[in-house]
Design a protein with these regions (language model features):
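Aromatic "clamp/platform" in nucleotide-sugar-dependent glycosyltransferases that forms part
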Residues: 303
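Conserved donor-binding/catalytic core segment of Leloir-type glycosyltransferases
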Residues: 220-241, 247-250
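Short hydrophobic beta-strand element within catalytic cores of glycosyltransferases
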Residues: 320-323
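A charged, aromatic-enriched C-terminal amphipathic alpha-helix characteristic of glycosyltransferases
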Residues: 217-219, 361-392
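Short alpha-helical donor nucleotide-sugar binding micro-motif in glycosyltransferases
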Residues: 290-295, 387
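Nucleotide-activated donor-binding/catalytic signature segment of Leloir-type glycosyltransferases, i.e.
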Residues: 266-289
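Carbohydrate-associated surface elements
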Residues: 184, 206
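Conserved acidic donor-binding segment of nucleotide-sugar-dependent glycosyltransferases
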Residues: 335-347, 354-360
């Protein structure tokens, strides 16, 4: 493939930015001309001065615009912030969009996309809503978002106009291809007023190659110190990630078991500190891969998710994922053929008790089989091959 590809994402960290980098690195490894453009390397909470205008806009969205009772993030004023449009090389043949909020405005997108192939990987619902990143049951994105529950009443007109602008813009980009990492998100996008007339491909997100290395460590037992569980979130206090559910269920399931441990990975989490709770802070990929190799289960209790990479990453280390039955997570479990979904905290407690019992009786799932399933389904090589067909208009 001789065409040049530029991946665009507001941050090179987080889910969208990580996927952009993994794809670009693998494409470059295969000899393609591929690069990543991002505004910041971290996130606005961790490094607010890295993009001060975007930080202010994000603060306005969070504290002035968003309805206090709405638990998912929104982007409205942030979408109007100038970003990378002037930095996109004029010679790029393919523009591959990821996390667009604050990276490229909708108005600018229609200008830079002219006469070029545009691929947009959806990492949440925001590309086809007026503001929210997850609608949490609201279906207004099917029409016009006029009664948006995510924002305070004075801003609902702005949300409606923003969605109308997205709908109009998508009709002005002839070379646009849409990709969703899960059937769940693809189905919602197909129902939306924004992408109703577009073909949407479903391609899983790739696993960071770091989690596929050091196979002996990846599948080694290394769990001689008792039952080990882990929960991960960029911000452990994020209400959407619902880490409190994981902590509560773990305490109930391990009552009377002195050597069990739940590791919490991410920023904050001080309110969860207590007996058998290990606050690990933020870990890099290599550190996290090593820790997952020594965990029995990963708990993902989120109230809303698309297809979080951490599920495949944990499985690639032989760790069993226990995930809430929301978004595209059930589909990931079915693809892996390993792991379990739960519908409420009581079910999670029961699953943890079952894992502890199986481990004690020597019936734990073969970690090598779990790791091999993840490698087969989510390797960068396989995912890049799928995207190659999208670039060529064959998928």
């Amino acid at each position: 493939m001789s065409e040049s590809i530029v991946h665009v994402s507001f941050s090179s960290a987080g889910g969208a930015g990580s996927v952009a980098k993994i794809l670009s690195d693998e494409q470059a490894r295969q000899g393609m001309k591929s690069s990543v453009l991002s505004v910041i390397r971290s996130d606005l909470r961790a490094a607010p001065l890295s993009a001060p205008l975007h930080t202010i806009a994000a603060g306005v969205d969070e504290y002035l615009v968003k309805s206090p009772g709405f638990r998912a993030p929104i982007s409205l004023f942030r979408d109007a912030s100038p970003g990378l449009e002037s930095a996109i090389p004029s010679g790029a043949d393919i523009i591959h969009l990821h996390g667009l909020n604050g990276a490229v405005t909708i108005d600018a997108l229609t200008r830079v996309a002219q006469d070029r192939k545009v691929v947009w990987t959806l990492h949440d619902m925001n590309p086809f809503t007026g503001a929210c990143h997850y609608s949490l049951g609201c279906a207004d994105f099917v029409t016009d978002c006029a009664s948006c529950p995510a924002v305070k009443a004075p801003f609902r007109g702005s949300v409606k106009r923003h969605l109308a602008k997205k709908i109009e813009a998508m009709g002005e980009i002839p070379g646009l291809s849409i990709v969703a990492p899960s059937t769940w998100l693809a189905d919602l996008a197909r129902k939306s007023a924004t992408f109703r007339d577009h073909h949407i491909s479903v391609i899983p997100n790739p696993v960071n190659p770091t989690y596929l290395q050091n196979e002996d460590d990846q599948v080694g037992d290394g769990r001689e110190k008792g039952f080990r569980a882990m929960a991960i979130a960029k911000n452990l206090a994020d209400p959407v990630k619902a880490i409190d559910i994981a902590v509560s269920a773990f305490h109930k399931a391990t009552r009377g078991i002195g050597d069990a441990q739940l590791s919490l990975v991410g920023r904050g989490g001080e309110t969860f500190a207590g007996h058998n709770i290990n606050l690990r802070g933020q870990l890099n990929s290599r550190e996290l891969a090593h820790e997952l190799s020594h965990c029995d289960v990963l708990i993902v209790p989120s109230r809303a998710e698309n297809a979080p990479l951490v599920i495949a990453e944990a499985a690639a280390r032989g760790c069993i994922p226990l995930v809430a039955d929301v978004g595209g997570m059930r589909e990931m479990i079915m693809t892996l053929g390993h792991g379990v979904t739960f519908s409420n905290p009581e079910e999670l407690t029961g699953l943890l008790e079952g894992q502890i019992k199986d481990r004690a009786q020597g019936k734990a799932t073969d970690r090598r089989k779990v790791a091999q399933s993840a490698r087969t389904a989510f390797s960068p090589e396989a995912i890049v091959a799928r995207y190659g067909k999208v670039y060529e208009g064959r998928e």
